[in-house]
From Swiss-Prot:
One of its GO terms (molecular function) is heme binding. It comes from the Bacteria. This is Catalase-peroxidase. The gene is katG. Heme b binds at residue 267. There is a cross-link at residues 98-226 (Tryptophyl-tyrosyl-methioninium (Trp-Tyr) (with M-252)). Bifunctional enzyme with both catalase and broad-spectrum peroxidase activity.
């Protein structure tokens, strides 16, 4: 390699391009290849705290009251390098917490403030997150002081809570328990646009039809948290903005009342910044020069701080007293007429007509100067949209009710992605169970598990019926927002009992048998369903010549319909399940990509996904009894036949349709088996084939069974946060 000789004059001895994005990656060369990286995130190799670090144990050492005092003191400790507006950082800290939690979307449970992901790209450099890097730097001395006893994820949300409390709001509560990640998430789809703040209708737009927002997205533009504050595509029209708000907030699991409360409560304090030229700002943190040390949007042309700060481009406060919690927002919004104007930075905003001098907020640095308050197009939507207006009027007339609704909505916003209360920690956890937490009562643990297994084994249910039902119950789990799973046995309730993918007729038959056993044994149906799956696997392993006991942890409870938000659970309905070789219909996304997404939500690794596919196929668990991918003559025995036959070169593979293939004997031309894309990707993709070959080896038959059991148990216990 003459061009890279270490001794050559003036040349770097490091291979050029290998350590940066200058070289082409495999995904650049083969963009249609499966990106298995989404299954291999956030492991101990990237975590500087090590594999043995236990955040919950560290939390037990935390002096919560001291931390809260330090945060409240921070609010009014203005720093010269980034001065606090009116001497109070509350508005900035609330915006940081809002924008951390506000990326959550209900469709796939991804986003949100549960991982501290705002520290990393792309979120740390989203246009809507401009200058939140300053908020995190202001928090750094506190993080440094308390160290491992408080995660960045918890600290950012708690800072928002303390900001509100320091300005007079009685918050609903707070739970610790969010664990930090250490690199950007690779599984979250933020949109296909190639530029920030791309308008709808352009290339790779997230909108189609009559402004139909692409699923699972919950924000109107690449780089915004929810709606464009200047109006749809930057064109002011409060009624159209109201439509966007209704869609985006619904996709964050909020109703109209919560939407009005969160918008108003978020704008009751603080201000927007646009008193200058946006063109004077430097690159975002991810694109800034080395010497900027991770700070972005720096203004080296003009003063750029205090009253001269530019962030969103919109300029001004919403209320007369932006550092206290009160009802001035609704007073100003509803008492005055408002007219369109532009900020010094050129952004559209609304200002009041003939406002009283005493209703104007003072300058952030000089209290002798007063300016007009402002409203964004989203604020005006609360006044113009008929339904939002009714809610706003009620909040205006009843400030106490507004404060209560906001406090609850803020708690929901900042905790929705944490999952069940079993994950909550700390002295301020509310005692009340909330329906959006998907509450599940505790189940019995003190019973004879083997006696129940014996009843199940004698029930007449087939291996396929037992395993399929247990899988369907557990597969709803989402590691993103910790919802779903087998605990609660909601598979027997609406809407899950009627989902097409759950085969209602087969499900009803199996549940009738298992519910009777559960009642006789005095245990939960949830435990019985999982136990039945385990019994089926043990029988199948024995048929393959391997004796194994599938681990089981009793204690699941049974949720009631009163504890179940039916509409909220609709988003958990599987559109496809590669593990049971099923999809509801053909989609633009390939079946193997949907399998990968499901595996990631289940928190499976690629080897775990592989071994589960091979086992589920030979157990005969395909939807509707389909024979696709059942590469065995011993259905019901937990053998490695799927992998043996998939890698056997005495067969060829021929497409017969969009998602169907035939496995043909090379010599005779006889069709031996049929398959789908999900089956054949394990022989096509080079990485998955490497795993498949491991399980096809003669010396790994027992390893296959043990690995299948381990992966199965991981899925069955995915939602058992009470065991952690």
């Amino acid at each position: 390699m003459e061009h890279n000789k270490a001794g050559s004059s003036g040349q770097c001895p490091v291979m050029h391009g290998g350590l940066t994005s200058a070289s082409m990656s495999n995904m650049d060369w083969w963009p249609k290849a499966l990106n298995l990286d989404i299954l291999h995130q956030h492991d101990s190799k990237t975590n500087p705290l090590g594999a043995d670090f236990n955040y919950r144990e560290e939390l037990k050492k935390l002096d919560v009251e001291a931390l809260k005092r330090d945060l409240k003191a921070l609010m009014t400790n203005s720093q010269e390098w980034w001065p606090a507006d009116w001497g109070h950082y509350g508005g900035l800290m609330i915006r940081m917490a809002w924008h951390s939690a506000g990326t959550y979307r209900i469709a796939d449970g991804r986003g949100g403030g549960g991982t501290g992901n705002q520290r990393f790209a792309p979120l740390n450099s989203w246009p809507d997150n401009a200058n939140l890097d300053k908020a995190r730097r202001l928090l750094w001395p506190i993080k440094q002081k308390y160290g491992n006893k408080i995660s960045w994820a918890d600290l950012m949300i708690l800072a928002g809570n303390m900001a509100y409390e320091s300005m007079g709001l009685k918050t609903f509560g707070f739970a610790f328990g969010r664990e930090d990640i250490w690199h950007p998430e690779k599984d979250i789809y933020w949109g296909s646009e190639k530029e920030w703040l791309a308008k709808s209708g352009g290339e790779n737009s997230r909108y189609s039809g009559q402004r139909d927002l692409e699923n699972p997205l919950a924000t109107v533009m690449m780089g915004l948290i929810y709606v464009n504050p200047e109006g749809v595509d930057g064109n002011p029209d409060p009624l159209k903005t109201a439509q966007d708000m209704r869609v985006t907030f619904a996709r964050m699991a909020m109703n109209d009342e919560e939407t009005v409360a969160l918008t108003a409560g978020g704008h009751t304090v603080g201000k927007a910044h646009g008193n200058g030229k946006a063109s004077n700002l430097g690159p975002d943190p991810e694109g800034a020069e080395l010497h900027e040390q991770g700070l972005g949007w720096n203004n080296h042309t003009s003063r750029g701080i205090g009253r001269n700060t530019v962030t969103s481009g919109i300029e001004g406060a919403w209320t007369t007293h932006p550092t206290r919690w009160d009802n001035e927002y609704f007073y100003l919004l509803l008492s005055y007429e408002w007219q369109l104007t532009k900020s010094p930075a050129g952004a559209w905003q609304w200002e009041p007509v003939n406002i009283k001098e005493e209703d104007k907020p003072v300058d952030v640095e000089d209290p002798s100067i007063r300016y007009n308050p402002m409203m964004t197009d989203a604020d005006m939507a609360l006044k113009i949209d008929p339904e939002y207006r009714k809610i706003s009027e009620r909040f205006y007339k009843d400030p106490a009710y507004f404060s209560e609704v906001f406090a609850r909505a803020w708690f929901k916003l900042t905790h929705r992605d944490m999952g069940p209360k079993a994950r909550y920690f700390g002295p301020d956890v509310p005692a009340e169970d909330l329906i959006w937490q998907d509450p599940v009562p505790a189940g019995r643990k003190d019973y004879d598990v083997n006696a129940v297994k014996a009843k199940i084994a004698a029930s007449g249910l087939s291996i396929s019926e037992m395993v399929s039902t247990a899988w369907d119950s557990a597969r709803t789990f989402r590691g993103s927002d910790k919802r779903g799973g087998a605990n609660g046995a909601r598979i027997r309730l609406a809407p899950q009992k009627d989902w097409e993918g759950n085969e209602p007729a087969r499900l009803g038959k199996v549940l009738a048998v298992l519910e009777k056993i559960a009642a006789e044994s005095g245990i939960s149906i949830a435990d019985t369903i999982v136990l039945a799956g385990n019994v089926g696997i043990e029988q199948a392993a024995k048929a393959a010549g391997v004796n194994v006991t599938v681990p089981f942890a009793p204690g699941r409870g049974d949720a009631t319909i009163e504890q179940t938000d039916v509409e909220s659970f609709e988003v958990l309905e599987p559109l496809a399940d590669g593990f049971r070789n099923w999809q509801k219909k053909h989609y633009v996304v390939t079946p193997e990509e949907m399998l990968l997404d499901k595996a990631q939500l289940l928190r499976l690794t690629a080897p775990e996904m592989t071994v589960l596919i091979g086992g589920m196929r030979v157990l005969g668990t395909n939807y509707g009894g389909s024979q696709h991918g059942v590469f065995t003559d011993r259905v019901g025995a937990l053998t490695n036949d799927f992998f043996v036959n998939l890698t056997d070169m005495s067969y060829t593979w021929k497409p017969t349709g969009r998602n169907s293939y035939e496995i043909v004997e090379r010599k005779s031309g006889k069709v031996k088996w049929t398959a789908t894309r999900v089956d054949l990707v394990f022989g096509s993709n080079s990485i998955l084939r490497a795993y498949a070959e491991v399980y096809a080896q003669d010396d790994n038959k027992e390893k296959f069974v043990k690995d299948f059991v381990a992966a199965w148990t991981k899925v069955m216990n995915a939602d058992r946060f009470d065991l952690v």
